[in-house]
C-alpha cells in the first residue's frame, strides 16, 4: 500500500526548467537557443499570422461579400425592453416615446441612424411610439395593445421593402 509521504510523480513526467544565457558551460549560454541575430533572435517578436512559410489561415479562407459604405446603423429595440423600462419607472407610458426618450431611459446606448422596433416580447401598455422603422410583428403588437406607432422612414423606401 502506498503512503501519502511516498507519493511522487511518474518517472520522466517532470522536467526542470532550463535557465538560459548563463555562460558557455551550461549548454544554453550566449545566444540562449535563439540562433544568431535576426528578427527571431530579438525579444518580444512573434509575427502575427505567420505560420513558418505555410499559407496562413486567413489567406486560405475564401473572401466573401463586402461592407457597404452606405450601411445604416440602427439601434434595435425589442418590445420587452420597452415594457421592462416602463415597469422600472424609467419610461412614462403616457408620454410620447421616441429615440431621445429611449436614450435618456438607458434602453439604447446611441441612435446614430434611428431606432428600429423589433417584435420580441409582449406589450401590455398603450404606447405612443415614434421610431425610424418597425417590423410587422412589432407594429401589430403596438396596435393590439391600443397604442400608436409612427415611423419616420421615407414612404417610398417603406413601400419597396414591403413588396420585396
From Swiss-Prot:
The keyword Ribonucleoprotein applies. GO terms for molecular function: rRNA binding; structural constituent of ribosome. GO terms for cellular component: cytosolic large ribosomal subunit. One of its GO terms (biological process) is translation. InterPro entries: Ribosomal_uL15, Ribosomal_uL15/eL18, Ribosomal_uL15/eL18_sf, Ribosomal_uL15_bac-type, Ribosomal_uL15_CS. Residues 1-49, 143-164 are annotated as: Disordered. Keywords: Ribonucleoprotein, Ribosomal protein, RNA-binding, rRNA-binding. The keyword Nucleotidyltransferase does not apply. Residues 22-36 have a biased composition (Gly residues). Pfam families: Ribosomal_L27A. Part of the 50S ribosomal subunit. NCBIfam families: rplO_bact. Belongs to the universal ribosomal protein uL15 family. Binds to the 23S rRNA. This is Large ribosomal subunit protein uL15. The lineage of its organism: Bacteria, Pseudomonadati, Pseudomonadota, Alphaproteobacteria, Caulobacterales.
